[in-house]
Amino acid sequence: MLQPKRTKYRKQFKGRIKGVAKGGSDLAFGEFGLKAQEPNRVNAREIEAARRAITRHMKRAGRVWIRVFPDVPVTAKPTEVRMGKGKGSVEYWACKVKPGRMMFEIDGVNEELAREALRLGAAKLSVKTRFVQRIAE
């Protein structure tokens, strides 16, 4: 699963996801993509599950780009532990996704296969997405 090799600080504030994606909202590598429609935190497990679903349906043909990276540590306290005594330990890594953010891109397959592969991948994500295609110039 994806996670940073090293970070400046071990733990982070929760924060809020406000506004729309400034960058990373257009197709940069592939012909087809999966674009986020709502703000949410997507964890590393979801990204990996979506990647596996997409590559499995494509039968290793074509190429997949993951445009999001889980760089936010999410902490949790163990169950049945009283409040206080400091912040919990890092449970998993997540990525804050804003609306309009391109999450996955694929190339080297036809539209029908790409649409189905990205639909299967989208089912693994906790954010509403839509299929996008590069417009022919």
Swiss-Prot record:
The record ties this protein, via SUPFAM superfamilies, to:
Ribosomal protein L16p/L10e
Q: Which GO terms describe its molecular function?
A: rRNA binding; structural constituent of ribosome; tRNA binding
Record key words, sorted? Ribonucleoprotein, Ribosomal protein, RNA-binding, rRNA-binding, tRNA-binding
Cellular component, GO, one term:
cytosolic large ribosomal subunit
Classify the source by domain of life: Bacteria
HAMAP family cross-referenced by the UniProt entry: Ribosomal_uL16
Q: What is this protein called?
A: Large ribosomal subunit protein uL16
In which organism is this protein found?
Sinorhizobium fredii (strain NBRC 101917 / NGR234)
